[in-house]
C-alpha cells in the first residue's frame, strides 16, 4: 500500500503539469529582495509561522481562512511567514504567496513538495523569498539543480531532513538552512524528540529549524537551546483567536494581577499578556469594586480577566463571573467540596484556578480534580500580594501544568522562567504603589519574556 508521501508525489506530477499550463513565466525573474536567512538570525529564537488551510493528517484545519487577517496577525510575531502552495492535500496555492507577500514585510517561504524548477521560478514570481527542498523527495542531482536555481534567484533554501540517512546525505551536498521534520511523512505521526535525536548529528554552526508537532510554549522552551527557530502551522491555524494562540505559543500564558485602572489593563494587553487579574477581596490594598471592575473589562474586552476570591460565597462569585464575563476564578481557601460546587455553578467558559499556598515541599498537595489549573503562591500573612517568593526548586518534579505567583519581579524573572510554569503571575513587582502599575516595567518585562 502506497504511503501518504508516495501518493502526494504521484499527484504532484499532475499538479506541476497544470501549473505549467496555467502560468506563463517572464524571461527574466527578479531576484529576491527580502533576506529570509538574515531574518531568522535577528532573534535568539525565530519563528516561521505558517498559513495552512488543511493537511493530510488533519483534513480541514481552518474553515475561516482569511489570508489578510492571518498575515496581519503574523506580522506582529513572525520572523518569516510560510505559505502552503500544494493544492490537493493542503488546499494551498501559489497565488496565496502573492497575497501574503503583498501584505507583509516579512520574508516568505514557499512550502510545497518541490520536484521541478518551474515551481521555484513560479514561487519567486509570486513573491517567495525562500523555498523548501526535501531530501525525502529529491535525489542528489535534482536537489543540487534546484538548490542552485534558488540561490541564483537570491532565495534562501530550507532543506528538510527527517532521519539519520538523510542527514548523512545532506552533509555531502550543499545546504543553507536545515529543517528537522518531527513528522514521519509515511505515517504522518509526530514526535518532537526527533529534533533532540537528530540535532547532534548536524554541524554546531548550522542554522537549524524544528518543524511539525509544535503545540505549546513548554515544547518551545524545551527545544529552544538546541535549535535556531521553529516552523509552526497546524497548532496556530486550528485556534479561533489566532493572536492569542501566537502569544501563548511564543510567550506563554502570563498574567498581571491587581489591576485597578483601565490604562494599566490596556498596557497589559498591548504587551501581550493573556490574563489580567481583578481582586475582589476587601482586605487587599488592590481590592476593586465589581462595578469599577466592569468598566475595565468593558474597556479592554480582548484581555482575559481572572477574578481573585478569598472564601467568598458561591452565589457572590457566580454573580460577579456572569456580570464581568470572567474567563477564570482564582480561589484562595476553598475546600475540594466547595470547588466542586462552584464548578457546577459557573459557566463552562470560566476556568477554576486552585491556589496552593506554599512555603516548603510538604505544602505541595495534589490539585483538586474539579480545578482546571493550580496556581502556586507564597504562603504568607495575606492571601496573595505578599511580595515574597518561595523556594521554586521544590516545584522541580511537578508534572501537571501550573501558574507561578509570589514576589515575581524584574530582578528574579530569569530565575522564574527556568521553573517551566505554564505562565507567570505578576503583581506588586510591576507597581508604583498598590494597584498602580508601572507601564515601563510592564514593557521591560514583555521584552524579557521574549529573550530566549
Curated annotation (Swiss-Prot):
Segments of this protein annotated with the region Indole-3-glycerol phosphate synthase: 1-253
CDD domains: IGPS, PRAI
UniProt pathway annotation: Amino-acid biosynthesis; L-tryptophan biosynthesis; L-tryptophan from chorismate: step 3/5; Amino-acid biosynthesis; L-tryptophan biosynthesis; L-tryptophan from chorismate: step 4/5
Key words, A-Z: Amino-acid biosynthesis, Aromatic amino acid biosynthesis, Decarboxylase, Isomerase, Lyase, Multifunctional enzyme, Tryptophan biosynthesis
EC number(s) recorded for this UniProt protein: 4.1.1.48, 5.3.1.24
Pfam families, per the entry: IGPS, PRAI
Molecular function GO labels: indole-3-glycerol-phosphate synthase activity; phosphoribosylanthranilate isomerase activity
Spans annotated as N-(5'-phosphoribosyl)anthranilate isomerase: 254-448
Family (UniProt): In the N-terminal section; belongs to the TrpC family.
Function summary: Bifunctional enzyme that catalyzes two sequential steps of tryptophan biosynthetic pathway. The first reaction is catalyzed by the isomerase, coded by the TrpF domain; the second reaction is catalyzed by the synthase, coded by the TrpC domain.
Name the record gives this protein: Tryptophan biosynthesis protein TrpCF
Gene: trpC
Amino acid at each position: 500500500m502506497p504511503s501518504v508521501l508516495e501518493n502526494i508525489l504521484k499527484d504532484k506530477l499532475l499538479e506541476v503539469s497544470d501549473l505549467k499550463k496555467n502560468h506563463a513565466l517572464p524571461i527574466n525573474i527578479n531576484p529576491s529582495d527580502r533576506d529570509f536567512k538574515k531574518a531568522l538570525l535577528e532573534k535568539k529564537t525565530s519563528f516561521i509561522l505558517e498559513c495552512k488551510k488543511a493537511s493530510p493528517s488533519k483534513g480541514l484545519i481552518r474553515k475561516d481562512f482569511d489570508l489578510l487577517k492571518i498575515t496581519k496577525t503574523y506580522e506582529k510575531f513572525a520572523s518569516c511567514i510560510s505559505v502552503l502552495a500544494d493544492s490537493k492535500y493542503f488546499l494551498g496555492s501559489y497565488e496565496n504567496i502573492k497575497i501574503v507577500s503583498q501584505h507583509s514585510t516579512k520574508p516568505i517561504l514557499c512550502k510545497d513538495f518541490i520536484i521541478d524548477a518551474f515551481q521555484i521560478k513560479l514561487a519567486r514570481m509570486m513573491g517567495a523569498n525562500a523555498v523548501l527542498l526535501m531530501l525525502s523527495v529529491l535525489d542528489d542531482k535534482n536537489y543540487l539543480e534546484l538548490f542552485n536555481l534558488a540561490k541564483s534567484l537570491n532565495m534562501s533554501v530550507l532543506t528538510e531532513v527527517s532521519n539519520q540517512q538523510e542527514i548523512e546525505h545532506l552533509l555531502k551536498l550543499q545546504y543553507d538552512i536545515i529543517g528537522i521534520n518531527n513528522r514521519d511523512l509515511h505515517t504522518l505521526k509526530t514526535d518532537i524528540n526527533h529534533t533532540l535525536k537528530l540535532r547532534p548529528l548536524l554541524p554546531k554552526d548550522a542554522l537549524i529549524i524544528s518543524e511539525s508537532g509544535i503545540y505549546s510554549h513548554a515544547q518551545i522552551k524545551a527545544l529552544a537551546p538546541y535549535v535556531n527557530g521553529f516552523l509552526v502551522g497546524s497548532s496556530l491555524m486550528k485556534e479561533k483567536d489566532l493572536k492569542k494562540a501566537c502569544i501563548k505559543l511564543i510567550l506563554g500564558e502570563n498574567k498581571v494581577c491587581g489591576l485597578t485602572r483601565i490604562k494599566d489593563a490596556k498596557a497589559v494587553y498591548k504587551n501581550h499578556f493573556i490574563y489580567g487579574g481583578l481582586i475582589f477581596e476587601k482586605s487587599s490594598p488592590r481590592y476593586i469594586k465589581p462595578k469599577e471592575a466592569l468598566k475595565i473589562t468593558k474597556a479592554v474586552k480582548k484581555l482575559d480577566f481572572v477574578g481573585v476570591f478569598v472564601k467568598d460565597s458561591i452565589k457572590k462569585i457566580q454573580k460577579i463571573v456572569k456580570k464581568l464575563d470572567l474567563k477564570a476564578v482564582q480561589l484562595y481557601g476553598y475546600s475540594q467540596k466547595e470547588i466542586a460546587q462552584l464548578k457546577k455553578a459557573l459557566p463552562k467558559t470560566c476556568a477554576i484556578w486552585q491556589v496552593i499556598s506554599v512555603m516548603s515541599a510538604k505544602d505541595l498537595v495534589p490539585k483538586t480534580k474539579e480545578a482546571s489549573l493550580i496556581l502556586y503562591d507564597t504562603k504568607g500573612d495575606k492571601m496573595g500580594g505578599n511580595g515574597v517568593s518561595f523556594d521554586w526548586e521544590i516545584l522541580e518534579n511537578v508534572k501537571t501544568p501550573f501558574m507561578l505567583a509570589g514576589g515575581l519581579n524584574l530582578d528574579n524573572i530569569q530565575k522564574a522562567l527556568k521553573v517551566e510554569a505554564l505562565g507567570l503571575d505578576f503583581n506588586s513587582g510591576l507597581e508604583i504603589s498598590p494597584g498602580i502599575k508601572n507601564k515601563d516595567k510592564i514593557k521591560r518585562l514583555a521584552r524579557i519574556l521574549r529573550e530566549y
